[in-house]
């Protein structure tokens, strides 16, 4: 279960992924080894899923962001489709959703030509009956930071 110190550690790591353990320890009034032990526990328990650098796509030649709604005609093709999306580097996210589409994909492509090629490949996946694409013109907010409510502490355990 998470306690208030765990939440403080998580907030710090979300804001500053490269924060030094000694700095975090000072913020939460623990020793660096105690903070390291807590971070390891958060990793082992799957609370912290990993560490990554957030790269601006435009600076590395990924100029087009799009969301693609994908309809799958048959229930038995859902898992196969999701598994195949793991093979596409330009597909950043693949979510099984409710509504008219079966999946929503977030993609970043080099240009519209690369997006068109990717769409063709996605449409050729067995079971795909339709795609709807929304190209992003501008982004007002894009974040990976989760708000962590203090009610997640003991006595208010999260449900899986």
Put a short name on every predicted segment.
Residues 1-160:
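A compositional/biophysical signature of low hydrophobicity enriched in polar/charged and small residues
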């Amino acid at each position: 279960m998470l306690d208030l110190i765990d939440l403080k550690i998580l907030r710090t790591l979300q804001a500053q992924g490269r924060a030094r353990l000694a700095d975090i320890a000072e913020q939460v009034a623990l020793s660096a080894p105690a903070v390291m032990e807590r971070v390891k526990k958060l990793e082992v328990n799957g609370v912290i899923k990993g560490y990554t650098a957030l790269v601006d796509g435009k600076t590395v030649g990924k100029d087009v962001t799009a969301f693609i709604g994908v309809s799958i005609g048959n229930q038995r093709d859902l898992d196969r489709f999701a598994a195949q999306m793991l093979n596409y580097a330009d597909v950043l996210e693949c979510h099984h959703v409710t509504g008219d589409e079966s999946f929503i994909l977030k993609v970043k492509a080099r240009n519209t030509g690369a997006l068109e090629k990717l769409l063709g490949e996605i449409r050729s996946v067995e079971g795909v009956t339709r795609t709807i694409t929304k190209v992003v013109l501008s982004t007002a907010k894009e974040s990976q930071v989760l708000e962590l409510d203090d009610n997640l502490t003991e006595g208010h355990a999260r449900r899986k």
